[in-house]
Amino acid sequence: MKNDFAVEASFFKNTLSLTFDYYWGRRYDIFMSASQRNIPPWLGADPVAANIGKTKERGWELEMRYNNSTKFGLKYYATAMFSHGKDEIVYMEDPEFTPAYQKKAGYQIGQQTSYLHSGVITSWDQMYTGAAVENTSGNNVGMLQLIDYNGDGVIDTNDIVPYGYPNRPQYTMNFTVGAAWKGISLSVQFYGTRNCTLVRSAGEFSSPHYYTVLDTSIMGDMWLPGSQEGGTYHHPVYKGSGASVHSGSFNMVDGTQWRIKNAELAYTLTAERLRKAGITSLRFYISGNNLWLFSHLNEDRETGGTRTNDNVMKYPLTKRYTFGVKIEF
């Protein structure tokens, strides 16, 4: 069941218009596969798929447009679009004795989770006097000191907690501005997202370098005895050592981004001599995509919360410039 409330309005002889939508709803009988079910072992039967999941959602969308012109023939416009959406799991058959912070219910779909950490282990004393790590493979001076969240004296999966947001943004923003005067036109589009958490990785290029190539921004901030003891990233380790489980929340990164998505400058000719040649208009333009980016990531990424085998560092979003001529007959 989904509900929607909308308002549309215009002002100043339609030069300014806005549209606002607020929606909310609940979903019932969501399919859960057998692997997602949590059936106690004493039941003596394997779980079966069932339509028992429940979620709720709410959000809003706002769009504003402004168009105007001057007595000198300058036309200009601006468009702004904002959206916010948030969902929540109401029921997903969480085990009865699971700690509240590890249950799915009450959190968003796709909520990121992680160990927490308190910095780099800089001495043997610090390592041995801290909470014991259940899997000590790769645990060493120079690694990250994980936090014993539930206070039982052992670092294990019970210390994994919700962290940040899901890997999809709660807020998206889109701004477009433009102007035209005597055949010259200019437009610029800005795009941004907020409230999402992404997972970064220090290892680049799974093939053919086999995770041996590291990002320079990470290398410059690694903890190294005697040379970079002020570093905040754990020392480099071989991927197969198992040390990746001790990265804690360090690799959880604020996914906020702002970018100039595209821009275009154009000039259109409609002179009488063009018409004599059978040409209605002649347009010259230069445009660019992905011209500027602000991000907490050390890469240009718009999809996914983590990397896949087709590592995004191999094919990042690229800047692209285009020059063209458009002829209309």
Name each model-derived stretch.
Residues 3-11, 16-24, 60-68, 76-84, ...:
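Membrane-embedded beta-strands that build the outer-membrane beta-barrel scaffold
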Residues 49-57, 100-126, 224-229, 243-245, ...:
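C-terminal beta-signal and terminal closure region of outer-membrane beta-barrel proteins
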Residues 28-35, 74-76, 87-103, 195-222, ...:
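Outer-membrane beta-barrel and related beta-rich outer-membrane complex signature
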Residues 1-17, 45-71, 108-109, 166-172, ...:
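Outer-membrane beta-barrel signature, preferentially recognizing the C-terminal barrel domain
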Residues 193-283, 288:
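Extracytoplasmic gating/loop element in the C-terminal half of outer-membrane beta-barrel translocons
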